Design a protein with these regions (language model features):
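Phosphate-binding/catalytic loop of phosphoryl-transfer enzymes
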Residues: 92, 96-99, 110-194
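Alpha-helical scaffold segments in soluble metabolic enzymes
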Residues: 59-62, 66, 107, 111, ...
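Conserved ATP-utilizing enzyme core subdomain
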Residues: 2-27, 172-269
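Short beta-strand-loop/turn "lid" adjacent to the catalytic site in phosphate-handling enzymes
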Residues: 46-103
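Divalent metal-coordination and catalytic microenvironments
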Residues: 81, 108, 264
Length: 271
């Protein structure tokens, strides 16, 4: 949730080229509002939800217009804006399952004067899917091979992997667990920075085996694939509960950061 990523690409039948990409940080007011809802689980009134939906849509549109200006591209050259939105809650295992995103597509279309395609996840969930990760179909288009099996890894806030078989079966994609989200929140809490640049803080600490074991012994990691998760599950509340349950409240913050750094690759390997 650091900001809005915009990629301008040209896609032909058998090729894709990136014309340019930028990241536009969220305005502080919007980032604070998102943190309260996503990370602190604060309730929203219908009015507050609607306002935030439109405001995030405006933020997305401003980022698109800025990117077009930066790379000297007129909006009439763009076929469509694809926006998967900002996730507020992802709950594919609830009854009924759902995934809720904001960033009003109509607002994006109106302010950019470009067709906007949005709400990518709901149909997949309605048909029994997870609604996440979104990239397996794209990975299949880009990287599938008739004689090689391939795995494509994406480490963002949440890490996900796509497995492509060589027998033309459907790709398998799922979230392995936290990527950078826990480390980023811990860094923000203790250093006041959005992330641990270069991993320098984590490298100054040492892994705490007992805490790592407790983190790995979590229900999500025991679920069968395909599966998906998000920040509503892996957040500071989750981390603090693990720290308390292992009596590690007096542990140094850098050792906890080092332990979180160990968590992500271990979960990737265990899958």
């Amino acid at each position: 949730m650091d900001g809005v990523d915009v990629v301008i690409s040209e896609i032909r039948r058998l090729s894709l080229s990136v014309i340019g990409s930028i990241t536009v940080p969220y305005k502080k007011k919007l980032r604070t509002a998102l943190d309260r809802v996503v990370l602190n689980n604060e309730p929203l009134t219908i009015h507050s939800y609607a306002v935030l939906d439109v405001e995030i849509g405006k933020e997305f549109a401003e980022a698109v217009n800025y990117a077009l200006q930066e790379f000297g591209i007129k909006n009439n050259r763009i076929i469509a804006v694809g926006s998967h939105g900002q996730t507020l809650r992802h709950s594919p295992s609830s009854a009924p399952p759902y995934s809720l995103q904001i960033g009003d597509g109509a607002t994006i279309a109106a302010l950019t004067n470009i067709t906007c395609i949005s709400n990518f996840r709901s149909l997949d969930i309605a048909k029994g899917g997870q609604g996440a990760p979104l990239v397996p179909a794209f990975h299949e288009w880009c990287f599938s091979s008739e004689d090689k099996e391939r795995s494509i890894l994406n480490i963002g806030g949440i890490a996900n992997v796509t497995i492509l078989n060589s027998d033309n079966t459907h790709p398998l994609g799922f979230d392995t667990g936290p990527g950078n989200c826990l480390m980023d929140e811990w860094t923000k809490l203790h250093l006041g920075k959005p992330y641990d640049k270069g991993g320098t803080w984590a490298s100054s600490g040492k892994t705490i085996p007992l805490l790592l074991e407790s983190l790995l012994d979590y229900d999500y990691f025991k679920k069968d694939i395909p599966k998906s998760t998000g920040r509503e599950e892996f957040n500071l509340r989750f981390l603090r509960e693990k720290i308390t349950s292992t009596s590690m409240r007096s542990a140094s913050s850098e050792n906890i950061q080092a332990t979180l750094l160990e968590l992500s690759p271990i979960r990737l390997l265990l899958h």
